[in-house]
Amino acid sequence: MRILFMGTPEFAASYLDFLIQKKFNVVAVISQKDKPRGRGQKLLPTPVKEVAQKYGIPVFQPSKLNEEGLEIIENYRPDIGIVVAYGRLLRKPFLDAIPLYNVHTSLLPKYRGPAPMQRAIENGERVTGVTIFKISEGMDEGDIALQRAFELEECEPFGSVYEKFIKYGTELLQEFLRNYPVTLTPQDHSKATYAPKIEKKDLYVDFSKPAVEVRNKIRAYDPTPGVRTFLNDIEVKLYGACEIESNSQENIEPGTVVRIEKQSGDGVIKTIDGLLHIKYIQFPGKNKITFLSAKNGGLIKEGMVFRNLD
């Protein structure tokens, strides 16, 4: 079976590398345009393009998919297209040229849209999964080919969940391709939910919320891009939220550093309904360190308050 692979970021590159390692016949790759990346903002190839070039697979970055993409299909004659985080909606007539299947990081119809991994964590889901579906014109609305669910740990951060999506997603993709064609099942559109794009405003944590909600917010963006708040008007990032203690002391302002633990190094922060243990804090231009290290360095102490600027 001749495969056209479409994808752009590091996540998609892991899938392309997997397919090649498993000896699937990837005949061509389509990725988005190269963009400036890194501190120097140097124009660099997309991670998917780098993998394709590494293995000598023809890679294309068309501006107009309905023109150039159709030409690629005509020249390379793929039997199927596999799409992983390509980053653009696919439209007719390209959609009709070959069967196109997308690997989506949620159990559709839940969490349609661009940020399903983070939104599931943020909402406190304990089960999520991977869906392979046939692409249609509606966003993530196509018929389902295969799904695989897996559990999330209570304190599991995005970085760990991301790795699970690569492991279980690539395994599911292999199963799909080995058994293709498979029976398709229409989605129940009445049960659809949406996972909107992550905006900068989403990255600020509010300690006047319940402790579980604050923990899930920190988990969803740990280790990247990291949630933000302000300490003495300095923007800091927080990582490693886990243990929650009950606390009914209403006289303590939410966001207050109640204590810093010597054994674990955690900061214990007041929320509206409890105390949340947070392992790491990161100051501008510095690496993340434990709250205890920050205290020993004179950067933070008990009684200080995390606040968001209005």
Curated annotation (Swiss-Prot):
Keywords: Protein biosynthesis, Transferase. CDD domains: FMT_core_Met-tRNA-FMT_N (cd08646), Met_tRNA_FMT_C (cd08704). Coiled coil: none annotated. GO terms for molecular function: methionyl-tRNA formyltransferase activity. (6S)-5,6,7,8-tetrahydrofolate binds at S106, L107, L108, P109. It holds the Pfam family Formyl_trans_N. InterPro entries: Fmt, Formyl_trans_C, Formyl_transf_N, Formyl_transf_N_sf, Formyl_transferase-like_C_sf, Met-tRNA-FMT_C, Met-tRNA-FMT_N. GO terms for cellular component: cytosol. The keyword Protein biosynthesis applies. Its EC number is 2.1.2.9. It catalyses: L-methionyl-tRNA(fMet) + (6R)-10-formyltetrahydrofolate = N-formyl-L-methionyl-tRNA(fMet) + (6S)-5,6,7,8-tetrahydrofolate + H(+). HAMAP family: Formyl_trans. Attaches a formyl group to the free amino group of methionyl-tRNA(fMet). The formyl group appears to play a dual role in the initiator identity of N-formylmethionyl-tRNA by promoting its recognition by IF2 and preventing the misappropriation of this tRNA by the elongation apparatus. Belongs to the Fmt family. This is Methionyl-tRNA formyltransferase. It comes from Fervidobacterium nodosum (strain ATCC 35602 / DSM 5306 / Rt17-B1).
